[in-house]
Amino acid sequence: AIDELKKLGLKTAIITSGISILAKYVAEILEIDYYLANELLFNEKDQLIPGGVVKVPLLDKEKILAIWVKNKGLKMSEIIYVGDSVFDVPVFKKVGFSIAWTCNPSLGKNASTYLCCDGLKCLVDYIRRLFSL
C-alpha cells in the first residue's frame, strides 16, 4: 500500500515516541523512507541503560517534526500527518493536512478529517483520493 503513496511522489516517515528498534523494523517492512524514534543505549556489558536517548519526547512530537521538516527543506504546510492518539493532536494543528486514524469522533474532530477503518489500504486510498481532486 505504501508504494501507492510513492507513485504519487510522496515521501513517508514514522515519528514515534516509541523505540527506534521497532520503528526501524516497521519502516523496513513497509518501505517507509524515514523514521524518528527514541534510541536504546547499552553499556559495555550489553546491558540496557535506563532512559536511553530521547529523540521524540511524547509531548513534543510537533516540535521534533518541525525541526525535521525544516532540516529537509520542507514546510509544515506540505505535510500530511496521520496519527491515532491524543498525543498527536498538537501535530494535527501544525501541519497542512491531518488525518486521525481512529473511530473516536472526539479525537477525530482535532484533525482535518478522521478515518474509521482497518488496514493501510483504507488510509492509502483516502490519500490517493485527496491527490485526485
Task: Identify the function of each model-found stretch.
Residues A1-L133:
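C-terminal cap/substrate-recognition subdomain and adjoining C-terminal extension
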